[in-house]
């Protein structure tokens, strides 16, 4: 249902009755995982900027409702830099390997802070850089679409979250995703690895990063 590099629904520790917003919902997988966790009194809103993915997600709603017995998930067309939800209306924002694709990541974090209720929290899984990639990789369109060339450094992610006014920031770098993609000889990862300096590997540059924080 879409690319993922972590498990933000588990990171978020969702509770019954909460309102959840998924940034870049794709085919809706994380929304459908979140739905039963928040239950009939909760609500899950998935936002995606592509009509094709929105149609796919909405097409999956019937199976979700039949399987779960719940009607608590909806999908909206919109950009994650300009979220189609009111201020202070969301308990939990989640996102799975999407923010790296945004051309204005600082604005995305501002939007996260805007839509969260006071005390609300964010749980994001994304790819991040331990150090800058070579220019040839950064200019590679396939590497951009593959969620690598657009990734920020861990320090840049931290700065964006804090600058947005979020607090209680916790970040955990996990090498397992990149190690798995490398061991599976993923074609994109092989291509990028070949462009790295001698002796360097993908895990020297890229990690899956879990980010959790709150709005004060």
Please report, for each region that a protein language model flagged, where it lies by residue.
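A short glycine-rich, Lys/Arg-flanked "PGG" loop and its adjoining helix->strand segment in the class I
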Residues: 106-121
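Conserved SAM-binding loop
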Residues: 57-58
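A short acidic, Gly/Pro-enriched loop at the edge of an enzyme's catalytic core
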Residues: 16, 81-92
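C-terminal lobe and adjacent flexible extensions of AdoMet/dcAdoMet transferase-like proteins
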Residues: 164-216
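Conserved alpha-helix/loop element of class I SAM-dependent methyltransferases that forms part
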Residues: 1-19, 30-33, 37
């Amino acid at each position: 249902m879409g690319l993922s590099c972590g498990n933000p629904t588990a990171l978020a520790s969702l509770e019954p009755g909460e309102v959840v917003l998924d940034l870049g919902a794709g085919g809706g997988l994380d929304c459908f995982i979140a739905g039963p966790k928040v239950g009939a009194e909760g609500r899950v809103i998935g936002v995606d900027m592509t009509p094709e993915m929105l149609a796919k997600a909405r097409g999956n709603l019937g199976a979700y409702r039949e399987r779960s017995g719940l009607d608590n998930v909806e999908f909206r067309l919109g950009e994650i830099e300009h979220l189609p939800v009111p201020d202070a209306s969301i308990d939990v924002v989640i996102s799975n390997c999407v923010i790296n694709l945004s051309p204005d990541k600082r604005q995305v974090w501002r939007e996260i802070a805007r839509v969260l209720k006071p005390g609300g929290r964010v749980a994001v899984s994304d790819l991040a850089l331990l150090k800058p990639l070579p220019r040839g990789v950064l200019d590679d369109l396939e590497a951009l679409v593959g969620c690598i060339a657009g990734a920020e450094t861990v320090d840049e992610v931290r700065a964006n979250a804090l600058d947005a006014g979020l607090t209680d920031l916790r970040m955990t770098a996990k090498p397992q995703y990149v190690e798995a993609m490398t061991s599976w000889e993923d074609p994109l990862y092989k291509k990028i690895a070949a462009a790295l300096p001698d002796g360097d590997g993908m895990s020297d540059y890229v990690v899956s990063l879990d980010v959790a924080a709150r709005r004060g």
